[in-house]
């Protein structure tokens, strides 16, 4: 493991300890513990697939990593459930690579990382050991005093906004890439209570004006069971769903 990557892993651990102490162990363990202030749009156009994430511990992206507890990973798939066509190790073979990434709601750009290279696709399905940064290129947007979105793994030098700039829901802010700790091109999306990437508390993400349906071949491409509890919570999404925005005109 590279020294820089190890350093960031230690930052994650330190951030977790800091958050536990700062918030006195008052984490968000359920969507019933927090009422979102904003309803978000999906940060992209077209139809995408939820490959990771949910609102229960069983379906969580990373339950023990507090900022990512309610995070999601999105990819684009074809009718067979494949995320690429052609050479698996060629980034350009992936359907989502280079697609526009959008602001999920109105807000102010708080932080940007824009100069990390795309990582290689490894034949063993693991992440690139030379990854210089876990989150890769990313944008953090302040939507309210208590809600910030972070979008990770963006294409190098594709970010079109600057710190301090205000954005509107649906504005193009970057393109999908493969920077950071990732096995293939995808969008990582999370809502957190501060702008700190490592020491914030992850918040449930409530979406509005989206179309969602379970991918009919889910069980053929993913052997992880789905939670019945997931399906009872309106507005919250979970892995296995195909999603798209109905409209980007709704406001906060």
Predicted regions mapped to residue ranges:
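Cationic-aromatic interfacial patches
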Residues: 1-24
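Generic structural motif
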Residues: 48, 101-109
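Conserved positions in beta-strands of structured domains
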Residues: 51, 108-110, 192
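Zn2+-dependent peptidoglycan hydrolase active-site motif and core
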Residues: 95-96, 106-155
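Short histidine-centered loop motifs in beta-beta connectors
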Residues: 147-170
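Short glycine/proline-centered loop/turn elements that form peptide/ligand docking sites
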Residues: 160-162, 178-185
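Short hydrophobic beta/alpha edge segments that flank linear recognition/processing sites
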Residues: 168-180
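Acidic, glycine-rich catalytic/binding loops that coordinate metals and/or anionic ligands
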Residues: 190-252
